Amino acid sequence: MCLELDNNLSDYFKACTYAYYSDYENFIKYYDNEELFDEDDLNFHLCIGIRNSYNFAVKMENSGLKLTSGILSSISARYIMSNKVCDFNFKYLPSGIWYPNVPTKETCIYLLEKDPKYSLVIKTICVLLGWDDVCDKCDKICTEVCFRLSIIFNRRSFCEEDTIYNYKIHENKNILEKVEKDKYLLPETILRNKDTTLEIFFKYNYTSKQSNIEQIIDDMLYTYIDYSQNTEFGPMDCVSVDKSVYYNMVSYKPYLDININTVEFNFLNSAYVLKHHKEYPDDLCKKAVLNLLVNDIYDSNFVSLYRPFYFYTYKTLNKYMVQKLLIDFPRQRYAILVNYAIMNITEDLENYSPDIDLIRIAYASGSIEFYNIMMNKAKKEGGMCQHLDFENEKYIFKYHKYEDVDFDNLHKNNGHPLLLRATHLNFP
């Protein structure tokens, strides 16, 4: 990667930045070996860089550095999510293999046949995506978070007979602690507190209290769809890295081909395309703007020039970004509200018509309050609208009478929309 950063930045900041962007050569140039064990931020950004790049994971495995267990677990996860299973995966069992993308069913079945312990992590994918055929091949074990998700997503049969464990990685060892079902794991209690579970699982916080602080990301069976909200880590959070690079990039030469996928899923390529936007087609610039928005960068000039159709990608927009976009671009409000449907945010829903796609996405995301509000409005008004043509990326308007809606198809849950947007091909 040919990314040049301002000389006044510290070597430590540069090491974290290059790790975050999966740039092995520059990471090696600026890091201090001792910091792999002492610095939380560096571990955190290494784990992100590894999960986002198969090539970076391979280089880190073969670097000769003494790596923390969280980093080793992230390398194992990246191999699996790229469907490149090897002996390494059976030495280091990852704690999460669904972020930033999921492996194929064939990869999951192969892992289960080779090592039944993979039931712990694959069962969670089954719950998220409704893979009942793969779930049948898993052992009757799951994690507490997976059990809670099975209740929230109305897939109780996936886990109802399972023995529940808390699972973590400590000093390169897999530690299982059996969890007894108590009143806090009763379905009614889980549903009453489902927002907390979804908040933990999908959006927030690598900074939970840990017995071994060096394991920043991968020591428990938690992984988060929106890792931009790492606010408790101070100045080295993801948002500050992205913003610093975007506004202070001295020069950059893309190391990946510039195309729809490498722009939508690679922040540096997005920044590069917009800095040379007159040389690229509008569709590519729209993907670049989207990548900036989900990384909390609102460049009003480019948002106005290249307004995307989709307003979510491998992560959702943060709540405040959604509110700003709703004010600035009211005609795109239903596309923007997809983020609320995914995150179960119900503010001001009374101001919007019930929308068939938002209802479907809310159902698939387990966003029950959002779903119920929209459905109740549809019943009261006698129908629901359709504002989005996802296939052709166009805004439309169609009205469906309530009695004409095919609710069996509407409630067909094909998995969480964020997970289904990404494939391993986007993570070189």
UniProtKB/Swiss-Prot annotation:
Question: Which positions are glycosylated?
Answer: N8, N205, N344
Superkingdom classification of source: Eukaryota
Transmembrane helix in keyword set = no
Keywords tagged on the record: Glycoprotein, Plasmid
What is this protein called in UniProt? Answer: RF4 protein
Q: Which organism is it from?
A: Kluyveromyces lactis (strain ATCC 8585 / CBS 2359 / DSM 70799 / NBRC 1267 / NRRL Y-1140 / WM37)
What function is annotated for this protein?
Answer: Not known.
Q: Give the misc comment.
A: The presence of the two linear plasmids, termed pGKl-1 and pGKl-2, in strains of Kluyveromyces lactis confers the killer phenotype, i.e. production of toxin and resistance to it, to the host cell.
